[in-house]
């Protein structure tokens, strides 16, 4: 595995791989990698011949009161995990490399519709930062395919629309959420949880599953279902940010009669905000 820090080095390495007829796969990350990231890299290796991973904690997607300064930087451990997972090229740019003219003057990309509401309402400017950095990275790497985890479901919807609307020549794959044995979705922010909070955290997925089962059983009073689910989260010690039933492509509110739905949740344990989702297929 080769590690590069500049766009010039990145493009040269990718060009060499492409000249050898290799199909390029790409997995963008913010580091502090866990088994979910490793699964994305391994899947990229199944779909492509040359796997590029980026590690960049993107300031543009953090709000002023969020955890940019405290977000864990664990490069040495990340490199070991990526080597084991089959990464060929690691790109670790600085903020100055990504935003050479500073962030205030950086052209930004807004993806309408799917970026609004849910996490977009709770974290103003977040998806603009995500869309901007992903656009830059896709232009830098120019991969044949890129992989993202379905845990960040709204982010995946934003990226799919971004790629479609801007006619970017890349296939986007969403990969299933990797979970701990008790159902908690793996997340770099799980490390912020203390022992008591970690014990309470699986209630998010448990509540989503119970809600999904009720919908599959024919329940159609979505407001009542959501009220019950919010109460279940609160009783488990979580503070819900949002809990919504949506249509999975447009992310419009789901209605009875929709055959494909996704339930999305965000909740706080102390100051740590966790997100999760569950797809519901009514065939």
Curated annotation (Swiss-Prot):
Family annotation (Pfam families): Pantoate_ligase (PF02569)
Q: Where along this sequence does the record place binding of (R)-pantoate? A: 61, 155
What's its top-level EC category? ligase
| Residue positions binding ATP | 30-37, 149-152, 178, 186-189
Q: What GO cellular-component annotations does this UniProt entry give?
A: cytosol
List locations, semicolon-separated: Cytoplasm
Keyword list, A-Z: ATP-binding, Cytoplasm, Ligase, Nucleotide-binding, Pantothenate biosynthesis
Name the reaction it catalyses. Answer: (R)-pantoate + beta-alanine + ATP = (R)-pantothenate + AMP + diphosphate + H(+)
Chief localisation class:
cytoplasm
Q: What Gene Ontology molecular function terms does this protein carry?
A: ATP binding; pantoate-beta-alanine ligase activity
The entry marks the following residues as binding beta-alanine, namely 61
Q: GO:BP terms for this protein?
A: pantothenate biosynthetic process
| E.C. number | 6.3.2.1
Active-site residues, record numbering mapped to chain = 37 (proton donor)
Q: Please give the subunit comment from the record.
A: Homodimer.
- Miscellaneous notes: The reaction proceeds by a bi uni uni bi ping pong mechanism.
Role of this protein: Catalyzes the condensation of pantoate with beta-alanine in an ATP-dependent reaction via a pantoyl-adenylate intermediate.
Instruction: Give the family, as the similarity comment puts it.
Output: Belongs to the pantothenate synthetase family.
Name this polypeptide is given: Pantothenate synthetase
């Amino acid at each position: 595995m080769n590690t590069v820090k500049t766009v010039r080095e990145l493009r040269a390495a990718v060009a060499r791989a492409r000249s050898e007829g290799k199909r390029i796969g790409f997995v963008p990350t913010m580091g502090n990698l866990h088994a979910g990231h490793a699964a994305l890299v391994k899947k990229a290796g199944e779909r492509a011949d040359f796997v590029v991973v980026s590690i960049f904690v993107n300031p543009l997607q953090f709000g002023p009161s969020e955890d940019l300064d405290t977000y864990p930087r664990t490069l040495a451990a990340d490199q070991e995990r990526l080597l084991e997972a089959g990464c060929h090229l690691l790109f670790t740019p600085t903020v100055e490399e990504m935003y050479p003219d500073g962030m205030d003057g950086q052209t930004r990309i807004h993806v309408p519709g799917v970026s609004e509401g849910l996490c977009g309402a709770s974290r103003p400017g977040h998806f603009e930062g995500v869309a901007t950095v992903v656009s830059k990275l896709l232009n830098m790497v120019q991969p044949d395919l890129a992989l993202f985890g379905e845990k960040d479901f709204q982010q995946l919807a934003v990226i799919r629309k971004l790629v479609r609307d801007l006619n970017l020549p890349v296939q986007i794959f969403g990969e299933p959420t990797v979970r701990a044995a008790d159902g908690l979705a793996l997340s770099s922010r799980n490390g912020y949880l203390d022992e008591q909070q970690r014990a309470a955290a699986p209630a998010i997925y448990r509540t989503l599953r119970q809600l999904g089962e009720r919908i599959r059983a024919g329940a159609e009073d979505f407001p009542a279902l959501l009220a019950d689910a919010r109460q279940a989260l609160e009783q488990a010690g979580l503070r819900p940010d949002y809990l919504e039933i949506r249509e999975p492509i447009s992310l419009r509110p789901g209605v009875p009669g929709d055959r494909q739905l996704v339930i999305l949740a965000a909740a706080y344990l102390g100051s740590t905000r966790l997100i999760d989702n569950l797809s519901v297929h009514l065939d």
